[in-house]
Amino acid sequence: MSQNKKKGGQNKGANQQLNQLISALLRNAGQNKGKGQKKKKQPKLHFPMAGPSDLRHVMTPNEVQMCRSSLVTLFNQGGGQCTLVDSGGINFTVSFMLPTHATVRLINASANSSA
């Protein structure tokens, strides 16, 4: 029984130290928030292998991220069609929808870029 008390006491001290460390880190993070930090400009997306009419050229970084996330999720969940090509390559074909506002913006942006 006395061994359990010792272990519990040591664990309590370690937990207290950990809680103090977390609190200090959170306080420090809160103090530095917004002080002289400029919003980092997102790097311009670059798709060197995409053709001139490729939709990726008119996508915003947020839309690109939504597409990447959707593709990975669909692939991992077994969505779409994944086949082996005669040359040894892998073909992955899937259709998915972005939110309506993104779809409308992409329709307008692609129409303007082709005109």
From Swiss-Prot:
Question: Which Gene3D superfamilies does the entry link to?
Answer: 6.10.140.90
Q: Name one Pfam family in it.
A: Arteri_nucleo
Keywords carried by this UniProt record? Ribonucleoprotein, RNA-binding, Viral nucleoprotein, Virion
Principal location listed in the UniProt entry = virion
| Classification via InterPro entries | Arte_nucleocap (IPR002484), Nucleocapsid_C (IPR037179)
Give me the stretches of Basic residues compositional bias. Answer: 35-44
Q: Where in the cell is it found?
A: Virion
Which domain of life does this protein belong to? Answer: Viruses
Region entry Disordered, spans: 1-54
Cite the record's Low complexity compositional bias ranges: 12-21
Q: Which GO terms describe its molecular function?
A: RNA binding
Q: Which cysteines are joined by disulfide bonds?
A: none
Q: Name one GO cellular component term.
A: ribonucleoprotein complex
Q: Which family does it belong to?
A: Belongs to the arteriviridae nucleocapsid family.
- This chain's protein is named Nucleoprotein
**Which species does this protein come from?**
Lactate dehydrogenase-elevating virus
Recorded name of the encoding gene: N
